[in-house]
């Protein structure tokens, strides 16, 4: 999903797109970016532990320094995803970020332990939605809309 969104954003050649895994991202990356697309699996009705760690490490160093920047959210969920989206929205509200779209929730319908642990295959329509969200964020930044 994140790779598809990055590919969509990269179509906007006026911008530099940087795709980072949560453990590799730091406050400096947030401060250097003009906008954000946060992507995470939902685990036990919450954002992943690695994404939570990212927000824990970067929240205060970025506070009052990223106000007004645009953001979007993508969640890969087994059945719901809304609680994870709300968690990120609350963090983004604290940072005073501006949402550009409702959270994109891709539901895998994984309900059994085997399905939950299995590597997920995201379908073409969902990947296109991810690409489109990345492209929308990038185009809005390039045009000065966001």
Give the ranges of each region predicted by the language model.
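Charged catalytic carboxylate motif
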Residues: 1, 29, 87, 129, ...
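N-terminal beta1-alpha1 ligand-phosphate binding loop
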Residues: 1-12
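Generic non-transmembrane alpha-helix signal with a bias for helix starts/N-cap capping motifs
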Residues: 2-3, 23, 85, 123
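Generic secondary-structure signature for well-ordered alpha-helical cores
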Residues: 10-14, 60, 93, 97, ...
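A short beta-strand-loop structural module common to alpha/beta enzyme folds
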Residues: 12-24
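Helix-loop-strand module that forms the ligand-binding subsite of alpha/beta enzymes
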Residues: 23-107
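Glycine-rich phosphate/pyrophosphate-binding loop and the adjoining helix
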Residues: 100-146
């Amino acid at each position: 999903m994140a790779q598809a969104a990055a590919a969509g954003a990269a179509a906007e050649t006026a911008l530099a797109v940087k795709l980072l895994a949560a453990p590799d991202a730091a406050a400096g990356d947030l401060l250097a970016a003009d906008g954000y697309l946060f992507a995470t699996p939902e685990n036990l009705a919450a954002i992943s532990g690695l994404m939570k760690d990212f927000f824990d490490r970067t929240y205060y160093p970025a506070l009052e320094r990223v106000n007004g920047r645009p953001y979007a959210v993508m969640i890969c969920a087994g059945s719901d995803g809304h609680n994870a989206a709300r968690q990120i929205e609350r963090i983004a509200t604290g940072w005073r970020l501006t949402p550009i779209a409702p959270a994109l929730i891709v539901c895998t319908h994984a309900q059994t332990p085997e399905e939950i642990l299995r590597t997920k295959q995201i379908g073409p329509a969902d990947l296109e939605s991810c690409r489109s969200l990345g492209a929308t964020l990038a185009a809005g930044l390039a045009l000065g809309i966001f």
